[in-house]
Amino acid sequence: MIIFTLRRLLLLLVTLFFLTFIGFSLSYFTPHAPLQGASLWNAWVFWFNGLLHWDFGVSSINGQLISEQLKEVFPATMELCILAFGFALMVGIPVGMLAGVTRSKWPDRFISALALLGFSIPVFWLALLLTLFFSLTLGWLPVSGRFDLLYEVKPVTGFAIIDAWISDSPWRDEMVMSAIRHMVLPVLTLSVAPTTEVIRLMRISTIEVYDQNYVKAAATRGLSRFTILRRHVLHNALPPVIPRLGLQFSTMLTLAMITEMVFSWPGLGRWLIHAIRQQDYAAISAGVMVIGSLVIVVNVISDILGAMANPLKHKEWYALR
C-alpha cells in the first residue's frame, strides 16, 4: 500500500508540474499578457515563485489581488459541490443497489429509465425548469444568491451555512434557514448528473457481485436478504466504484460553472466565466490552476481510497490505470 501511495503521489506531482505550463502560457503567450515583456525563462521563474506563495498577481479589470478573490469564491463552489456530491452518494448508492438486485424487473427498468432521463437533461435547462416551478410559480424557494437581502453575514470560512451558524447575530437561526433555502435548487440541479452516474456504476457492480458463489452460499445458509446486501454485496460492490467517483466530482466542477451562472451563485465558476468574458488573463490563469489542481488531487485521492478498500488494486501499475 505504501508503494502504491507513493506512485500516486509521484503521478500527482508530475501532473501538477505539467499543469503549471498551461497556467503560465495564459500569462505569457496571450495578447497583453502581464509577463510578456520578460524573457521566457525569467517569466516562468517569476510566475512559478508567485504560485508557490499563492500570489497570482492582480486583476487587470479591477486591480484587486486575485488570491483574495479566490478566497471569496472558492469556498462557495466547494460548499455547493460537497453538498451535491454527498446527495449523489446518499441517493445513488442504495438506488443503484436496488436496481442491481432487481435486475430485469420493473424496479430496475424504472430506475434505469429515470437515470437515463436525468443524465440526458441539460443542466441549464433543468436549472431553469426548477427555478420556474419552485421559485416563480410556487414561490417556495429563492431564485439566486446565498442569503436573503435582509441578512448581512460576515464571511469567516466562506461556507454560507457555517458562517451563518457561528454568527453572533440574534437572527442566527433565520440566517441558517435562509442559507439552506438558497442552496436547495443549486444543489439539486448540480447533483442530478452525478447521481445518475453513481446509480449506473452501482447497478453494474452489484450485478457482478450478486452472481458470485459466496452470495448464493450466504442465501443457502438462511441469511436474510438485508444481511446479504449489507455484509456481502455492499462490501464488495462499492470498492470498484470508489476510484470512479473522483471523475464524477471532476465533472461536477464543470457543471458547477453553468449552475452558478443560472442561480447567480458567487462561486469560482461564475468568477472564471466573467474573467474569460473580460479577457482577464491573470485571473483565467489562476482559475485554470486552481480547478486543474483540484481535479488532479481529487482523482488521486479517490484512487488511493479505492486501493485501500480493494487490496487487489495495490499491485496494478499506475500507468495502466
UniProtKB/Swiss-Prot annotation:
Residues 74-302 form the ABC transmembrane type-1 domain. It is a multi-pass membrane protein. GO terms for biological process: protein transport. Belongs to the binding-protein-dependent transport system permease family. OppBC subfamily. The keyword Lyase does not apply. One of its GO terms (molecular function) is dipeptide transmembrane transporter activity. PROSITE patterns: ABC_TM1. InterPro entries: MetI-like, MetI-like_sf. Residues 1-8, 102-113, 196-248, 302-321 are cytoplasmic. This is Peptide transport system permease protein SapB. The chain crosses the membrane at residues 9-29, 81-101, 114-134, 175-195, 249-269, 281-301. Involved in a peptide intake transport system that plays a role in the resistance to antimicrobial peptides. It is found in: Cell inner membrane. Keywords: Cell inner membrane, Cell membrane, Membrane, Peptide transport, Protein transport, Transmembrane, Transmembrane helix, Transport. Its main location: membrane. Induction: Part of the sapA-sapB-sapC-sapD-sapF operon, RNA detected in mid-log phase cells. Residues 30-80, 135-174, 270-280 are periplasmic. Pfam families: BPD_transp_1. It comes from Salmonella typhimurium (strain LT2 / SGSC1412 / ATCC 700720). The gene is sapB. The keyword Ribonucleoprotein does not apply. GO terms for cellular component: plasma membrane.
